[in-house]
Amino acid sequence: MAKILMTGTSGAFGTLAAQAALKAGHQLAAAMREPDGRNAPAAAALRALGATVVEIDVIDDHSVARGTEAAIAALGGLDVLVNIAGVGTHGLSEGYSSAQLMRVFDLNVVGVHRMMRAVLPTLRAQQTGLVINISSLLGRLSLPFYGPYSATKFALETLSDTYRAEVSQFGVDVVLVEPGGFKTSWIDALVRPEDTERLSGYGQFADVPAQTLTQVEAMLDTRPEQDPAKVAEAVLMLIDTPAGARPQRTVVDFIGMAEPVSMMNDLATQATAGVYQAFGSDELLTLKLR
């Protein structure tokens, strides 16, 4: 059974993925902010299932270092890092202040980088390991009103691909999960643009983002197959798949976006292989197994 450190376990996807991992018999260090404060109920529920709960705020270098060290000590090692912590955005892009945009990037992109830097020395030293980064279909295509969020996921995709090549020869696998839209508490926590004065220049069009989000939520209510538990199942599948056999990207969507994004992924894989071969670096695309 794998020794797993998972971030964002107080949120919807994180809670489901943590529960799935524990029920499958894996050892889990469940990371979250304020496990003795506002997230105490989530922490208690995971402890009851057998998890070790560690406090990690992925936007704080010291918190990441302390929490990761505590997790590895509690687990007696580490096999898998699952990066789930993140935040969504919805609204007109111009209405987001520079500070808002920087905060979203700090959490969704730099936070993943912090976590990977914290665990990679351990994984590289043992010449084996797995990192699963939760991205989004909006990291492969763009839709209006999700600009800052989508930008972070495009960045995460590139960061993950680069890491994947750079650590492949140390036996460390880096893969992505790309969920579509799911109706979870994540929607309630979406970051909205704070510059209302700037948005006033859009007139009635400033109301369109809220209207479209209402339509999306109504649509999701009619699509029970778009179950967030499917994302947790995808994470568990990747953990249980042998090294060298895992897909680089796993799309999780059941409302029509999976096929076109999967086609884009296949084309990107082919193009990337050609570029790496042209530069004589194609061996980096193959995971080195012990």
Which residues fall in each region the model found?
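Conserved glycine-rich cofactor-binding loop
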Residues: 10-11
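Substrate-binding pocket helix/loop in short-chain dehydrogenase/reductase
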Residues: 92-93, 100-102
